[in-house]
Amino acid sequence: MADSQDPLHERTRRLLSDYIFFCAREPDTPEPPPTSVEAALLRSVTRQIQQEHQEFFSSFCESRGNRLELVKQMADKLLSKDQDFSWSQLVMLLAFAGTLMNQGPYMAVKQKRDLGNRVIVTRDCCLIVNFLYNLLMGRRHRARLEALGGWDGFCRFFKNPLPLGFWRRLLIQAFLSGFFATAIFFIWKRL
């Protein structure tokens, strides 16, 4: 049973609840503020992963299957019992769970925002949060979380002043600008 005085338990539960319920909010609902630094960072990192792997994640956007079972299956694949997991694997799992819970415009119109749908979404959020929490706080995965530095380690691992995509675009723009400037200078000298 979870120790209410254990900061890792508390932070893990709060982070998972923040992220899963954030993903499950109805369209046109304002984003609630993140409950912690790691929650803000998780939202940002998962958003980047979902954009980079949009084709994969979009295939699950309209999933009508059992969300909890899908998360369990993905957890079995990503957090294998044969190896220690990495932050990247954990974030991929959370991005997957968030995608399943996403109530994007298409799903909201299809489900007509009725009370029954809201109850099902809330139930699934609670089930997924509890599953992920129990998985991560189990002896094996908790030890790995601690070895990775806990949620402070998560923040250190992913915190960059600017995302990698920004630097790639900047590098490409700088290269192309230099190339075009050289070409224009070369042509101008020839005239």
From Swiss-Prot:
InterPro entries reported for this sequence: Bcl-2-like_sf, Bcl-2_BH1-3, Bcl-2_fam, Bcl2-like
One of the GO BP terms on file: microtubule organizing center organization
Chief location of this protein within or outside the cell: mitochondrion
PTM (free text): Monoubiquitinated by UBQLN1; results in stabilization of BCL2L10 protein abundance and in relocalization from mitochondria to cytoplasm.
Keyword Protein biosynthesis carried by entry: no
Parts of the chain that traverse the membrane: 166-183
Any one GO CC term of the record: nuclear membrane
Molecular function, one GO term: calcium ion binding
Residue ranges annotated as motif BH2: 144-155
Tissue expr: Expressed in multiple embryonic tissues. Restricted to the ovary and testis in adult mice.
Protein's cellular compartments: Mitochondrion; Nucleus membrane; Endoplasmic reticulum; Cytoplasm, Cytoskeleton, Spindle
Superkingdom of the organism of origin: Eukaryota
Keywords, in A-Z order: Apoptosis, Cytoplasm, Cytoskeleton, Endoplasmic reticulum, Isopeptide bond, Membrane, Mitochondrion, Nucleus, Transmembrane, Transmembrane helix, Ubl conjugation
Cross-link (Glycyl lysine isopeptide (Lys-Gly) (interchain with G-Cter in ubiquitin)): 112
Reported cofactor(s): Ca(2+)
Annotated motif BH1, positions: 79-98
PANTHER family: BCL-2 RELATED (PTHR11256), BCL-2-LIKE PROTEIN 10 (PTHR11256:SF47)
Subunit structure: Interacts with BAX. Interacts with BCL2 and BCL2L1/BCLX. Interacts with APAF1. Interacts with ITPR1, ITPR2 and ITPR3; the interaction with ITPR1 is increased in the presence of AHCLY1. Interacts with AHCYL1. Interacts with HIP1R (via ENTH and I/LWEQ domains). Interacts with CASP9. Interacts with BCL2L11/BIM. Interacts with BIK. Interacts with UBQLN4. Interacts with NME2/NM23-H2. Interacts with PMAIP1/NOXA. Interacts with TPX2. Interacts with UBQLN1; in the cytoplasm. Interacts (via BH1 domain) with BECN1.
Biological role: Promotes cell survival by suppressing apoptosis induced by BAX but not BAK. Increases binding of AHCYL1/IRBIT to ITPR1. Reduces ITPR1-mediated calcium release from the endoplasmic reticulum cooperatively with AHCYL1/IRBIT under normal cellular conditions. Under apoptotic stress conditions, dissociates from ITPR1 and is displaced from mitochondria-associated endoplasmic reticulum membranes, leading to increased Ca(2+) transfer to mitochondria which promotes apoptosis.
Similarity comment: family membership: Belongs to the Bcl-2 family.
Name of the featured protein: Bcl-2-like protein 10
UniProt source species: Mus musculus
